[in-house]
């Protein structure tokens, strides 16, 4: 029984370590701060590889980065199946980084684009509020991650600092 529990614990630890490396790799490949990807993953799934989150508008989100089911048809063209997103942490992290990179390309490297990762691009007051709330949550998580590494990020009360100034700290 103890050996069985140890084996499960080691598999879980291995999966987390593997996923941690994937944040760094995806960040490098998409030129996104890996800690920003980590912050989004914590906000979306609390780092749960097999997380499923219901989205009343589009269906559901899958895995660490909560990749939305609305993208499944597009992802299928690349051989990515929904089950890959809840069983392969690297696939999920890279897919999330891909969609964040699309948001950055569309709206620039900004907290508004981070908000669009979750709330989409529709330009309505409600969506603007959802983007800001999401980006603010991610920013708080992100600064916590940076702080744990001894990196200070300027606090601001009015608005979020420019994302590039934060990433370069």
From Swiss-Prot:
Keyword Signal listed: no
Coiled coil: none
Gene3D superfamilies for the chain: 1.10.530.10
SUPFAM superfamilies in alphabetical order: Lysozyme-like
Top-level taxon of the source organism: Bacteria
Keywords: Plasmid
Family in the record: Belongs to the IagB/IpgF/P19 family.
Protein name: X polypeptide
Gene this protein is translated from: yubQ
């Amino acid at each position: 029984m103890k050996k069985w529990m140890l084996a499960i614990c080691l598999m879980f630890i291995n999966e987390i370590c593997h996923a941690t490396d994937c944040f760094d790799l995806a960040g490098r490949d998409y030129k996104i701060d890996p800690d920003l990807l980590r912050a989004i993953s914590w906000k979306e799934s609390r780092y749960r590889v097999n997380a499923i989150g219901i989205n009343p508008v589009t269906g559901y989100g899958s895995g660490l980065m909560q990749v939305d089911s609305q993208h499944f048809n597009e992802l299928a063209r690349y051989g990515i199946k929904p089950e890959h997103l809840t069983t392969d942490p690297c696939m999920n992290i890279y897919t999330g980084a891909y969609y964040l990179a699309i948001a950055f390309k569309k709206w620039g490297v900004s907290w508004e684009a981070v908000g669009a990762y979750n709330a989409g691009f529709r330009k309505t007051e409600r969506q603007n509020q959802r983007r800001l709330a999401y980006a603010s949550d991610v920013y708080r998580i992100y600064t916590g991650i940076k702080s744990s590494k001894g990196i200070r990020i300027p606090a601001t009360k009015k608005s979020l600092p420019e994302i590039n100034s934060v990433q370069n700290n």
